[in-house]
Amino acid sequence: MLGFKNFLKEQVEVESILKYYPSPREVKYIRSVRHKLIMKNPDMKPIGDDKLHVTLAGGPWWKKMSSKFKDVKFDDPNFQLEFEEPKKVESSGKVSWYMKVKQQRQLKDYVTDLLQSNPNPKRVFHVSIANKTGKVGDSVANV
């Protein structure tokens, strides 16, 4: 069950990356898919509900520009995210499972509106749901 804290959290937050935290409804769906995935792949560990996120912007451009957005409260997307079926990705010794956001164009336009720029034009918006350790930093970043 989601803690009360999750209902108070902004959905878009400026951190070392610009993150979108899934809504409680989205988390519920992701959790059910993740549970089935872990049952079929017991070597994978789930990423905790409170760590689930979609990276909206990151990389060198974001590192340079993020301080300009530190105190900005961004509007949340005005659409519910939907996700594709989970896929496995491997890179540099890391293995993770992710779910791609179905509304790639809509989310790209949303980020461009927020930042008045598209810092990662080739970004594939996704949420990592499981990896070898369950630690979010151990997921493959770019799918």
Give the positions of each predicted feature.
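Proteolytic processing junctions in secreted/extracellular precursors
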Residues: 2-11
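Histidine-dependent nucleotide/RNA phosphoesterase domain, centered on the 2H-phosphoesterase fold
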Residues: 11-143
